[in-house]
Structure formats: C-alpha cells, structure tokens
Amino acid sequence: TLSWQKDLGDKKMRNEFGEGSTPALHGNHLVVVWDHQGESFVVTLDKRTGKELWRQKRDEIDSWATPLILEEDGRLQVVTGGMKKLRSYDLETGETVWECAGTTMNPIPSPVAGDGLVFLTSGFRGNSLKAIRLTGAKGDLTSSANIVWTLDRDTPYVPSPLLYDGILYLLKSNNGLLSAFDAKTGAPHYQVQRLERAPNVFASPVGAAGRVYVAGRDGTTVVLKHGTSFEVLAQNTLDDGFDASPALVDREIFLRGYRYLYSIAEP
C-alpha cells in the first residue's frame, strides 16, 4: 500500500548524468538535497506523511553528494556539500548553522565525520578537501580556525572518503590510487599508492576488523591492512564489475555487481 508520494519537480542535470544524492533519514525527518540546473533547494519531510517541514533555497548547481546528519552540542545538523558553498542546517528548523567556501564542480563524495570533525571532498576539475571542526562552528567559516586542514591534490571524484579509527582514506579521482592521512592533523601516512588489480574505482572504500576493502570496476576487491603503512593483504577477483560500495553487516560483506548480488562470509 502506498502511504504517500511527493512531487519535487523536474530535475535538470547537466550531461544527462541523472540523480545520485540519497535522502538522509533521522527519526521522523527525511532530508532531500535537490541541486540541479534549475532552482536548487534542500527540503525536510515528515517520513510518516510526506508533509514538508521546512525548505531552504540553495544557490547551487548540480551535486550528487548525500547529506550527512550529525549532532554537535546537542543540536542536530544536516551537512551538505556544494560547489559554491559547504553548509550545515539545523535539522529541526532549517536555519543555516554555518557555511564556508565550496569545493570543485560536480561534488559527488558524501561527507564523513568523526572525532569532532567533518570532512568534505570533491575532485572534478580541481581537488578539494576541507576538515572542519564542529565545536563552535557558526556563521561563515571560510577564513576561520574551524578549518583545521585542507588538501588540494589527489582527492576523489566519485568515491567518498573512509574515516576509520582516526585515519582518513582517500582515492585519487576514480583511480585505484590510495592515500591515508591522520584525520586530526592532515599529516600523511602514505600517499597515492597503487592498487594494481583495481585501477578504476567508483565504489567508496569501507573498513572493518582491521581491514580496508576497495571494490574495483574490473571485478577485483583489494583488501588492505588498516594502519599507517600501506600493506595489501589480498586481492579477490569475481567475474563481474563493481560500482556500488560494499555493505558490511555483522560478519558478511555484500557486493552488488553489474550482474549479481554477492554475499561473502566465512563458511
């Protein structure tokens, strides 16, 4: 039975790339970012009824990044990427909490957060990473001390970064070239290390049990040791290709290939 539906209008994307931003859900709040070639906005709906709770116009063009909902100082915030500005909205009211200068064209990677920081990246026609301290973040942060560190090279175009136990992992563009940084300081542990059997990557890396998994478009998943040194533990190839990010549930890894859905676990 259909409970409700909501027409948000026609979305006009450049180059016929289509849509890519996933709605974000927290409690009864369903957040949708609608950045396109027309009038862009972010809207929050009641998940039970589809009723519009708030809407904010956005001076943005196309983006594909999924918003991130997080809590800071008891306040729930919606963090969004963007070419012109990075923004955070109050989840309850839609008020802009903070903003700062944006990233590059075509922002696709989704924000990740941890240890009091949120990380926003992009990598089309340029490179951009901003590590933003959430404590005390308010108003325009562009030239403030809340921008803890930045990076202007070797950032991802499609894959989102992985923040795992204090280490931020980044792929370069859509290539199997991996870097790892101290998340708090930006100090590099290693940079642009080649994943030889996964040269092309759209999927975001994932981490669990002291390992990092990178699924390549050519069918190979590279397994690396989580840590400050680059060490490949295994390279597992299936007769398929992967663009979707792996999903980790308990002790299983789910891979959605071009042809099949795989569940991988110890027997």
What spans do the regions from the language model cover?
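Noncatalytic, solvent-exposed loop/strand surfaces
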Residues: T1-P267
